[in-house]
């Protein structure tokens, strides 16, 4: 069995599994609630305005859809994201080893084929589950609300934030760019469970470790005097609205660190130390 066949098997297992459906359901419940509670009332009343701002403007897509409307729904979504991305498939490397399924694969293909295919499947499911609810919410809100490019003081995005110049001129390009970035970061976050799988002997630790790590990072990075380190707090990195400024250097560090850890602690050790 070559890499292409192995990858096909892993992707089918990942995207047809119950875990993937559960993650999408969790994200969609939050997305739909936000749409019903925030978007629909604004769409029902065209003269609705946002109160308490320096400049009041009619509600529109750029300050009402879930990712740009700072409220409990988006906050909950960000906090649950580390769990949402791992539920679909991140724990299966651990369970495959425990159930002996991996022995069947190793008898039919090279270890590296299985390990890389698993990594890609986990990465893709994590990215998809993190972005699909946001994309659907954006599309639904766009169907019922106007798209107004408003003055800086009336929009949630920090004027000094990353790509803010794009947001205040071409907001949809900004959304696409940030959703792609979120896809990558969420996918990599899910792969942390693969790394942990080689070092622990408990399924719940494998499942919950990314969430615990994110909360730990949220606390610890706040102690730093360096803005790039502060910017690596997950609650900031996954916040598209940038109420706290994001920095491109923080994303580069985040991506490089997880890629290096994945290459060394998962791929290299997986190939060397897995014993059939």
Stretches found by the model and what they are:
Residues 23-30, 203-217:
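Central hydrophobic cores of alpha-helical transmembrane segments
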Residues 195-202, 270-275:
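Membrane-interface helix-boundary motifs at transmembrane edges
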Residues 88-125:
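Helix-loop-helix units of permease transmembrane domains in multi-pass membrane transporters
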Residues 1-27:
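Aromatic- and glycine-rich beta-strand/loop motifs that create alpha-glucan
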């Amino acid at each position: 069995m070559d890499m292409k066949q192995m990858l096909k098997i892993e992707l089918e297992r990942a995207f047809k599994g119950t875990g993937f459906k559960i993650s999408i359901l969790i994200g969609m419940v939050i997305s739909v609630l936000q749409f019903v509670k925030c978007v629909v009332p604004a769409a029902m009343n065209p003269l609705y305005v946002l109160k308490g701002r320096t400049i009041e403007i009619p509600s529109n897509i750029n300050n009402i859809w879930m990712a740009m409307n700072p409220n409990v729904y988006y906050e909950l979504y960000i906090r649950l994201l580390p769990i949402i991305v791992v539920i679909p498939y991140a724990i299966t490397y651990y369970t495959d080893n425990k159930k002996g399924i991996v022995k069947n694969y190793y008898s039919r293909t090279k270890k590296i084929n299985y390990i890389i295919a698993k990594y890609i499947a986990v990465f893709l499911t994590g990215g998809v589950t993190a972005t699909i609810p946001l994309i659907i919410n954006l599309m639904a809100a766009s169907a019922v609300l106007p798209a107004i490019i408003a003055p800086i003081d009336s929009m949630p995005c920090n004027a000094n934030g990353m790509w803010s110049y794009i947001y205040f001129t071409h907001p949809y390009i900004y959304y696409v760019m940030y959703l792609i970035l979120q896809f990558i970061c969420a996918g990599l976050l899910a792969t942390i469970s693969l790394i942990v799988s080689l070092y622990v002997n408990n399924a719940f630790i494998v499942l919950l470790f990314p969430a615990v790590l994110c909360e730990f990072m949220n606390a610890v990075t706040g102690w730093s005097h360096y803005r790039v380190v502060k910017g690596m707090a997950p609650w900031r990195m996954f916040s598209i609205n940038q109420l706290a400024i994001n920095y491109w250097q923080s994303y580069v560090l985040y991506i490089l660190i997880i890629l290096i850890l994945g290459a060394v602690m998962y791929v290299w050790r997986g190939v060397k130390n897995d014993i059939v």
